[in-house]
UniProtKB/Swiss-Prot annotation:
Species whose genome carries this gene: Chlamydia abortus (strain DSM 27085 / S26/3)
Domain BRCT: 583-660
Protein name: DNA ligase
Annotated family: Belongs to the NAD-dependent DNA ligase family. LigA subfamily.
Names of the cofactor(s): Mg(2+); Mn(2+)
Length: 660
């Protein structure tokens, strides 16, 4: 069909929608209705479908995400993209000021910017059109995430004539608190793992292979720096320039003439922190004068002219209404706090972790208390303390029940006197948790078999134990509410795929008490086959580094229970094929690793798995026995400790080279 539009009209329509996007997403002052906007966008897509040769790189349709990629190419940064050192106390902050004054010979002006808890990116414009976006990576090279960055509505795809022709901006990609809550609600609805925090969600979204899927999540960005010949000498003035060029700059950057003003501003921002629409974990303090920045220079990893002052985790005060006891897959009873709902870090919190009975006793937590709740990097908040001044009269110390809250059989207390366990192998709570864990991401990784679906199949009588997973039929799945043909096909396909499982994952999936991912990997590396693991004696097991008496006894006891042996044999008869382990022979064999900071290419869990698969060990703290510290973005105190001990430090890229 012949188009009734000219190319000039097409370009004019692009400009109109571009202006609408700027008013809506940057100025938050729309001038047309959502309906009118949608009609314009439909018109644009129709024209581009008829005339694909007209489509420009800055077309608003580029934000819809039309690329699916199998990878993210690694590209060198034109300018190093280093991280910023952290300070957690005023003492560390004054040490930073002292170093600056000692080098410069005077007290400079400082610019303060809120430290949004997101993902740093570099975005390049040529002829004022967005042509490339890279992740931070190792600071020297990053991944090309251009397609996903284009989906950010507040980011201009084309700059006005007032902006430089060639420009690179640095920014933080993030989710607002409200959007993050919506994303996790969608994850729960789909029975997928929730994101621990907005930063993880943003990082995961930028790594989505489908830009169309990324576009649906509504990422945002705040620009914190620019590289252009037209830049002024003041960093603060350059941020104002970025705003004039159409970039979003959140948080009203401040210019401070004195150190006293800097410190006062830090306190003011902390007070206002909870009211911000996005998560922040501190304030970035930068020497304002660009020439001073050049004098101060940089280390291999950090700029010497900037510091991130980190705030303590956000805390909320609320009432502990009850303590609920949950039963896990190994039968361990875990107390969970039921709270009077309170808003914390932008989300509504009604439950919090209490860990165990000893922790409750140590903190003297009682039902009816006013408690303090914090949410760090975890999904579930924690009760960190009690306001004793507000304790009501008549409260009683809490004690663990003597009977399982699900099957009502008497519980047993472990020799460590911390763990209380329901030993009834038929307890429905424990059975459902075992099946759910068996299907989970760290085990067989069977898609769409989350807690709700597993519970429904159990209640329907379709499954009674783990081996029944491999006998699930199409008729069984049709009884699950919401399951249609496509979902059913996907589940059955995923179950079939899970029948071929590496030895370490199968051992993990069994859920042997005290045997986690690391222990399962150690067993697989040592014995190479399931038969050898099952036949191992106590002495055989104790000879493996990292397997102590308690773990060895648990493994032997597990494989001496007839019902466990029978279930494993049933799985094998149903076509489960356990892939033998090939002993690692890399330079990682036997080496002890510790990881600090946020990795760009791998999740923490993936990095730990790769290290273990190559025969290495992963620890949680740095000591003289640590062979390597792997450092990601925003490393913690472990880096300082490693430097003091002379522990070799690896970047993420160096780790990958060592592994492969």
């Amino acid at each position: 069909m012949q188009s009734t539009y000219s190319r000039e009209q097409y370009i004019s329509l692009c400009k109109d929608i571009e202006e609408d996007d700027y008013r809506y997403y940057v100025l938050h002052n729309p001038t047309i209705s959502d309906y009118d906007y949608d009609m314009k966008m439909r018109q644009l897509l129709s024209i581009e479908a008829q005339h694909p040769e007209w489509k420009v790189l800055w077309s608003p349709s580029m934000r819809l995400g039309d690329r699916t990629s199998g990878s993210f190419p690694i590209v060198a940064h034109a300018h190093p993209m280093l991280s910023i050192a952290n300070a957690y106390t005023l003492e560390e902050l004054y040490e930073f000021f002292s170093r600056i004054e000692k080098t410069l010979g005077y007290t400079p002006k400082y610019t303060l910017e809120i430290k949004i808890d997101g993902i740093a990116v570099a975005i390049r414009y040529e002829q004022r059109v967005l042509v490339q976006a890279l992740s931070r990576g190792n600071g020297r090279k990053g991944e090309d995430i251009t397609a996903n960055i284009r989906t950010i509505r507040s980011l201009p795809l084309r700059l006005s004539k007032e902006a430089p022709e060639f420009l690179e901006v640095r920014g933080e990609v993030f989710f607002s608190r409200a959007t993050f809550c919506q994303i996790n609600a969608a994850q729960r609805q789909a029975e997928k793992p929730e994101f621990a925090n907005p930063r993880n969600a943003a990082g995961g979204t930028l790594k989505l292979l489908s830009a169309k899927e990324a576009a649906q999540r509504n990422l945002e960005i705040s620009i914190y720096g620019s590289l252009a010949e037209e830049n002024k000498r003041s960093h603060y003035e350059n941020l104002l320039l970025c705003k004039e060029w159409g970039f979003p700059v959140f948080g009203q950057p401040r210019q401070c003439q004195t150190i006293e003003k800097v410190v006062a501003s830090l306190h003011e921002i902390e007070v206002a922190r909870a009211q911000l629409p996005m998560e922040i974990d501190g304030v970035v303090i930068k020497v304002d004068d660009i020439e001073d920045q050049k004098v101060l220079g940089m280390t291999a990893k950090h700029y010497r002219w900037a510091l991130a002052y980190k705030y303590a985790p956000e805390r909320a005060e609320t009432i502990l209404e009850d303590i609920i006891v949950q039963v896990g897959r190994t039968g361990v009873l875990t107390p969970v706090a039921k709270l009077r709902p309170v808003v914390l870090s932008g989300s509504r919190v009604s439950r919090a972790s209490l860990y165990n009975e000893d922790e409750i006793e140590r903190k003297d937590i009682r039902i009816g208390d006013t408690v303090y709740v914090e949410k760090g990097g975890e999904i579930i908040p924690q009760v960190v303390g009690v306001c004793l001044e507000k304790r009501p009269e008549g409260t009683q110390p809490w004690v663990m029940p003597e009977y399982c809250p699900v099957c009502h059989q008497k519980v047993t207390r472990e020799s460590d006197k911390v763990s209380v366990r329901c030993t009834n192998s038929l307890c429905s709570a424990g059975v459902i948790e075992k099946i759910r864990f068996f299907c989970g991401r760290d085990a067989l990784d069977i898609d769409h078999l989350g807690e709700k679906v597993v519970t429904k199949l159990f209640d329907l009588g379709c499954i009674h134990r783990r081996c029944d997973i491999f006998q699930i039929t199409e008729e069984d799945l049709r009884q699950v509410p919401g399951f249609k043909d496509k979902s059913i096909r996907n589940v059955l396909k995923s179950i079939e795929k899970a029948k071929s499982v590496p030895l370490d994952r199968f051992i993990t999936a069994l859920g042997i008490p005290y045997v986690g991912i690391g222990g399962a990997n150690a067993l697989a590396q040592h014995f190479l086959s399931l038969e050898s693991v099952m036949a191992a004696s106590l002495d055989d097991l104790k000879a493996i580094e990292g397997i102590g008496d308690k773990v060895a006894e648990s493994i032997v006891a597990y494989f001496h229970q007839p019902e466990h042996l029978e279930e494993i044999q049933k799985m094998l008869s149903l076509g489960v094929h356990i892939l033998p382990c090939h002993r690692a022979s890399s330079s990682c064999l036997g080496k002890a690793f510790v990881i600090t900071g946020t990795l760009e290419k791998l999740t923490r869990s993936e990095a730990e798995t790769y290290i273990r698969n190559c025969g290495g060990k992963v620890g949680s703290s740095v000591s003289k026995n640590t062979d390597y510290l792997v450092v990601g973005q925003d490393p913690g105190s472990k880096l300082k400790r490693a430097q003091e001990l002379g522990v070799p430090i690896l970047s993420e890229d160096e780790l990958l080279k060592l592994l492969y």
